[in-house]
Amino acid sequence: METLRLPWFRRIPVLFLAIGLLPTVIFGADSQRKPFTVRDSIALTKVLDFNTSDGEQAPGLFSPDRSHLVILTRRGDLARNVNVETLLLFDAREIQTYLSSANVKPEPHAKELVAVSAHQPWDGISHVSWLNNQDICFTAKLDSDFAQAFSINIADGKRTQLTHSTSGVLSFAVAANKVVYYTLASATNSRPRDVGWRSFGELIEPDGSAAHGSPLVELFVKSTNGEQSRRIDMPVSRLSQTFQRIWIAPTGNYAISFRPAASWSSDWADYKIPHYELFGYSPDKMAGGDYTSPEVQNRTQYQLIDLRNGAAKPLLNAPSGFLAQNYTPAVVFWPSDGKSVIVSDTFLPLDTGDQQTNHQRQLGPAIAEIDLASGKVTEITPEPYITPETDRGSAALEHIVSIEWDAKENLLTVRKQQRGKELSSQAFHKVDGAWRQEPGRAEEAVSKQEVTVSREEGLNERPKLYAKGLSCGCRKLLYDPNPQSDQFNFGHAEIFDWTDANSNSWHGGLIYPISYVKGRKYPLVVQTHGFNADEFLIDGPDGYTTAFAAQPLANSGFLVLQIGDSRQAMTLDEHEGERYAEGFHAGIEKLISEGLADPAKIGLISFSRTGWHTLYLLKKYPDLLAAVTMADAGLIGYVADILSVNSPKDFKMQFSKVVGGIQKPGDWMEKSAMYQLSAIETPVRLEANDPGSAVATWEMYSLLRSANRAVDFVYFPQGNHILFSPENRLGSQGGNVDWFRFWLQNYEDPDPAKAEQYARWRELKKQQAANAVTDHAR
C-alpha cells in the first residue's frame, strides 16, 4: 500500500453569468478546436522530473558551472507502441540573452543529446546526472539486452558505455573515476528455483513489474577506465527503487548507500514511528539477518562503503527516516576535508547517555554529520516529525522540501514549507568543528543563481517551462512541450469542496464538459486516488495513466469529479473503507443537489487502494452507480490474502486490519465487502495489469459472473500498475471512455475494431435487464 501524500488547496471563487431565462454556455467549446481524445493524451510530450542533489524534484538539471541545462521528455508513439524519451540540452548563455532581450520569440534552441524508445519504464532514460561541465551520465536500454550506464559529451555527442552488466543496471553513481552501481542479483532463466521469499508476482513473471519494484540486488564498483567490476561486500539484498541511491565521495575512497535493516538492537523499538503497530522497529518485525526477506522492504539504514577494498558496514546504529513519513528528502553531502559525511532523513543512535537527548532523538529523524574514522555523530538540526495532530490532519506539518550544501562556505541551507505558507529557510554554518544556525544567510544559495527554470501549470493552465533571470527580474517561456495543444478543447476545472456524513472535509477538482450549459444535468464520472490543485488534469492525478481519462471524458460530454484523499478518512483500519465510501457518496450527492449531475447517470473509476473503498460504496449504496471500473484494484479478499503470504508482516497486518481482523479463512466471507455484492445491478469493469493482479482480480470476477451479474474483465499481461505502453493506455483509458459512454450515454463508437467489445457489452446489458426483473420480483 502506497504512502499517503495529501495535497491541500486554496478555494477559488467562481463567477457565474446568466442571461435572462435562456440556457447559457458558461465554458464554451471553440468551434475551431478539435475534441481531445485518449490518443491525443498518449501523444502529449511530458517533461519528466529529476532528483536533484538537494533532494527536490526539478524539471531541469544545470551543469555544475550552470552553463548548460538538460531536460528529459517523454511522448507516446502509438504506432510503434513505445514511449520516446529524449534528453534535450539548452545553452544557459542563450537563455540569458533571451531573457535580457525585448523579444519573446523564438525561444532558445534545444539540442537533442539522445533519444530512447522504451517498451517498459526500466528501459528508458533515468538516473541523469552531470559528471562534469561537459559530460552527462544516465542509464538506458540502448544497444544491449539490459539497461546500462552511459556518459555522453555535450559538445561532440560521443557516447561512452560505463557498465557491461549481464543482468541490467538498476541505478548508479559516478565520481572521482569510480562507477558504483546496483544490478539485479541474477539474470532470468528457466531453471527450477526455490520460491524462498519471492512474491507471487516475481515467481510467475520474473522480468515484470514485481521484480523491478523491490528486487534482489547486488552492488558493484569499477573505474571509468575500463577496470573489471568488483562486487561490494554486501549480501544479496532486497532493496526497492526508493533505496537504490548511491553517493560517492569526491576523493573516490568512500560511498554512501542504503542497506536493508535485517536486524537491529533492542533500543530501536524506542523510535516513535507513526502507526507503530504496523511500521515500528519491534522485535517481531526483525528479519533475523536475512537481507532478502520481504520484512526489510521499507526498513533500511545508511551504509558506508570503502571503495578501496569493497568493505561495507552500517554508517549508524539507527534506521533511516523513511518510516517516519515526514517527507524529508534523503540527501548526502561530503565536506571538503573528506573526513566526514552529512546525511539527512536518518534517526540517530540512542547511546548518548543523556535521557533528554535520547528522548529527542526518539521523536524523529535528523540531519547529522558523521566522522568517518571514529563514527562520532554531530546533530546539525532535528527534522519535523509526525504528531497525533498532524497525523489526523487537524494540524499542518512543516516539512523539509530541500537541503542545499555549499562546500566552500561550509553552509547547509534547509528549506521548509507548511500548508498555505511561503517557504522558510534556515542556514547552518560549521565553524571550528561546531555547527550553529546563522540567520540571514539562508538566501545566499538562491542569490548566486543568475537563471532558474521551473515548471508552471494550474487547474486550467497546461504545463510549460519558464526561465527567470535574477538581474533582470524577468520571466519568459522557455519550452512549451505541446504547442499543438492549442488546437484542442479542454474542459474547464474548478476546486470543489464538500463535507460528508461523518463531518469529514473533502476536496477535489470538478471538470466541466466542453460546451457546458448552466441548468443542464450531465452524466458524471468520478475519478479517485487523489487531487492536486496546481495540476492541469489530463488523465488522472499525478499523471496516472491507468483507467483515468479526465479530459477525454470531459470532451465526451461528462462532468468529471476528481476526488482528493482525506487524512480523516484514511484510518488504516476497518473504518477506512466505510469512511471513504461516505466521502465519495457525499461528493456525488452534492453535485446532484446542485443540479449539475444526472442522478441516473453516475459512474466511478477506482484504482489501487480506492478499489477497496469502492466495494464499500457498492455495498452501502447499491443503486448509486450506473457503471463502475475497478482498475488494478486492491480488492482485499481471501485470494489476495493468500497471494500475499510472502509480503512483509506490516503489509499483511494492514491487509487484515482494514477488514477488522482475520483469524481464519472464513472471516473473509463475513467481513469483506467483496462477498456481499452478489446482488448488485451496477455493471462492473475489472482491469488487471499483471499476472498476480489477474489472479487476485479473478476472485471478484468469478463471484459476479457466477451470480450472473454484468461484469467485464480486461487483462493487460505485460502491464504496469501505472500503465506505461501506449497500447495498454489506449486499452485502459480509451476502454473506460467507451465503457461509460455505453452505459451512461447509450453511445457506441462506430469504429469496426470495437465491434466485439460492444457485442460483449450488449449481452451484459441484456443480462442486467433480466437481473433487474428477477431481483425486483423477489
Regions found by a protein language model. Give the residues of each.
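N-terminal secretory signal peptides that target proteins for export/translocation
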Residues: M1-R10
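Bacterial N-terminal signal peptides
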Residues: I12-T24
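Beta-propeller folds
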Residues: A18, G28-A445, E450-V451, L459-E461, ...
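Non-catalytic accessory segments flanking enzyme active sites
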Residues: A58-L61, H68, T73, Y254-R259, ...
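The conserved beta1-alpha1 loop
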Residues: E277, T528-H529, A688
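Short beta-strand-to-loop junctions in surface cap/lid or active-site-entrance loops
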Residues: G508-R520, S672-M674, S678
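Short beta-strand element of the alpha/beta-hydrolase
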Residues: R520-G530
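Active-site-proximal cap/loop segments of hydrolase catalytic domains
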Residues: P541, T546-S556, V560-R778
